[in-house]
Amino acid sequence: MSEVDETAFEPLLSEEAQKGLRGPLRPGDYYLFGSDACVEGAILAGCRYYAGYPITPASEIMEKAAQRLPQVGGRFIQMEDEISSACSLIGASWAGSKPMTATSGPGFSLMMEAVSFAIMSETPFLIVNVQRPGPGQGYITSSQEDVMQARWGHHGGGSLIALAPSSVQEMFDFTIQAFNYAEEWRVPVILLADETVAHMREKLTVPPRDQIKVINRIKPQDLGIPLEKYLPYEPYEGKVPPMPAWGDGYRVNVVGLVHHPDGNVTKYSPEMHLACVSRIYQKIEDHADEISQIEGLFLEGCKNLVVAYGTTTRSAVEAVQELRSKGKKDLGFLRLKTLWPFPDHKIRSMVGQLENVFFPEMNLGYMIHPLRETLRDRAKNFISIPCLGQLHSPDQIIEKIKETIGK
């Protein structure tokens, strides 16, 4: 590990440094909390606006954003609740910013109406959900219980994107990727973290700036569209409509109602409704192979498969490696980096016929359902390995596998 650049933390060390602006982290190696890595990734992605309300275990992201955003010329605001926080992101996005917030289960529930509005109005922003157990207030430890809510919690149709990081490095990398997805597809993106990865401290490597891919939304002026011919919800042969900011001179309709390409909401018809909602749904689902990310280990000749996502990946990989070292050479591993859109085609392209599929999740077994639908003709048995309130140990996973396929 190279030496940490201490000047990156000057604002913590002197009042003089705190008076000036300081840019994003310089390239190099750092030793950071997952929450801090998330904020630093957001800054490098171009985020300059954070609105939020504190909730354990997501408050550290808010605290770091409150410290760091003013240092890079950004804005931080603590809102009165999670409802206003999410709604504030909509306004900030249309003002031309790349906005974000962070919350946990109870707060995430309160944000669902704004998420639905953002899907319909095609407003890009990032919500980091540092998941905690539920229902209700549940507890403040680790969980993966909001994975279905991320996709289906908003009302109505439409689709969105959700990623699941497993390390401090991925809290940084996936935050940048999440902003890129939001900007490219004009959609809210959910980063499904959890208490474990948010509060762990690990090495973070910040690559050189020219190696960090940052995508910005396409504006109508980029395409040479005249002011008088601009239609707010017309893709113009692209994947999504170009998005101006307020003040750019274009007529902007921020519409939560079903609408025509020009933003008109008064000439309703079932045909118009179908066309509108189908487009905002299909722009994500029809490009699932382009958006989704998975990775596999030991898949050649695999007859028994362990699938995981998020921090559960860490225990699952260790369990697979331990069993393979003891002779279980037909045991493979598949990791879902993207949960939504669900990577069904990619999964089918990577695995063959299977005897057993094991799926450890920090919930009662949620993502095993779309996986079963995807591999219903490829696998005989689907075995959920649930755990609530804490990360699985590798031994828990090993025990279930041995119980099923023998010692």
Task: Go through the PLM ranges and name each one.
Residues 33-37, 284-304, 317:
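Glycine-/acidic-rich phosphate or pyrophosphate-binding loops and their flanking alpha/beta elements
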Residues 66-71, 279-283, 318-333, 376-378:
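Short helix-loop-beta junction
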Residues 2-152, 159, 176, 379, ...:
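Thiamine diphosphate
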Residues 10, 355-357, 361-407:
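Peripheral docking tails and interdomain loops at the edges
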Residues 313-350:
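Generic long, charged, amphipathic alpha-helical segments
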Residues 4-12, 189-295:
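Conformationally flexible catalytic loops at phosphate/diphosphate-handling active centers
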Residues 141-195, 218-222:
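Conserved thiamine diphosphate
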